[in-house]
Amino acid sequence: MKKLFYILTMLLLCHTAWADKLELRLLNHWDNPDGTVERGYAGKSIWKWSMIPAGKKQMPDSLKARYEEYGRINQQYGINGTVLNNVNAKPIMLTHSMLQKTAKIADILRPYGVKVYLSINFATPKALGELKTADPLNPKVQTWWKKKADEIYHLIPDFGGFLVKANSEGEPGPMDYGRNHADGANMLATALEPHGGIVMWRAFVYSAQGGDRANQAYDEFIGLDGQFKDNVIIQIKNGPIDFQPREPVSPLFFALKKTKMMVEFQITQEYTGGSIQTCFLAPMWREFFDTLGTIKDRQPLAGAAGVANIGDADNWTANDLSMVNWYAFGRITNDTEASSKNIAREYLRSTYTTDERFVRPITQLLLKSRETMVDYMMPLGLHHIFAGGHHYGPEPWCNPKGWREDWLPKFYHRADSIGLGFNRTDHKERCLAGDEGSGNVNQYPEPLRSLYNDIHTCPENLILWFHHVPWDYTMRNGLSLWDNLCYTYDRGVAEADKFVDTWKAAAYIDSKVHARQMKRFERQAKDARWWRDACLLYFQQYSGMPLPPDSPAPTHTLDDLMRYHLDIDNYTAAPIDRLP
């Protein structure tokens, strides 16, 4: 079966060789040296640093076999690079012993056409005690990085380069020294340039004092357009907030005219159900590329990064069907015009069975899964109303003492007695928190700016992203916003119930895999009710309106849901048997 999958995939990639193929197609692992995986839901890290020898000793056979399999899968999926460690990088990753271990991984992956990259901590020379500063304009710092690059390329001649998260969420960066992003990125790029390496500098930056978080990446980078060296690529998340189930495209992709860019997708399901729920992400990425294609006056993408969803689980992703997203990332970045339906069918036929009694219904299930999840989680443009910290489950009321305002759901949903949603227009909309729009729409080129700015033309699946909409506002189907919100949540729950029935009737694959996945679909249906009840009961406090008469009564009470607390951290999958 694996050999057949390899042949079929190679044929597909050859067939799409003339399509819009991104040059860089990289996995980004958010794996830490201690084996934990930030936002990882498939066990511990596959990179067993404590088991990899630093000197001349050979890699243990068990690890070597696992990494060879990893290389083969990436080659089959069309992925040509991997960043081994978390963007919240530990300075230890650039010590000589860790670089020797990295070189051993690179040696194993090289035959499969997979280059190795590393995330770096910008303050590494200072953190390791080798310098007193990490100021990018300090000659000693520049020399340190040049020598470190020489050391890396001596060990790994085809090393890809650095991924950098700087001055974001507490990570160090050039702004600590009064410098800007270009100063920091260019210093690193100069060190890597003689070796052909690149710097991928993340645009995920925001601060508590910055106003609308959706504006901040644009505001911080637009003035630096054209100031970055040729081997610097700005890595931008697909949307302007943070991998929500639905976001508009980040306006930076349209704004930067003289700077190389790559898109960052999240394959791991931080906001889309972890390893419990099934959410086929190709439709989300298809939406991104389709929107990007509506604007012709823009820089082409230099590549794509996908935050990996794998761990040391036997099946790589814990949820068997989540592996389709690893495949989809490789497939759609090799052919940015690929259809979601074709991607789903290819994967199911080559992985499970060619029996259409399975392939046809499960293809349809996958194609519906993302929209269904949006419906029962954050419909109509709602966003950032998940549980604090671990992000699993609904918590639109989340308000821990001492947290920054822009980490709280209220900052984004802005529910009040007037309406719901975030006014990101260039004009006033009635809202108890203030009438003025954030002006986010003005970061978009025409016709997107006008489309989003007018409540009557704004796509209704983004209306609460861009507008504070009155509860009694009449939507295009003739119903009020409140009734539409209720019915959309209801539709999501009903579809999640259908997924259980569809999977149950498609028992044409390995019985153990089928049973394992059955438990996840049953839990997903319960999660859909959890989300629906939590959000409607919470927002009903503001709307003061009853549920429509044909809307099912809630299963839970708001008090019970607000008392429930899931005690896990950012490195742990939600326990399927301890949820409401």
Predicted regions and their residues:
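Catalytic domains of carbohydrate-active enzymes that cleave complex glycans
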Residues: D297-P580
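Catalytic-core regions of glycoside hydrolase
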Residues: W30, K57-Q58, T133-R345, T351, ...
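Feature activates predominantly on carbohydrate-active enzymes
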Residues: W18-L163, E193, F280
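Hydrophobic alpha-helical membrane context
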Residues: C14-H15, Y177
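Sec-dependent N-terminal signal peptides
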Residues: L4-L13
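Structured segments of extracytoplasmic/periplasmic soluble domains
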Residues: I73, N85, L155, A191-H195, ...
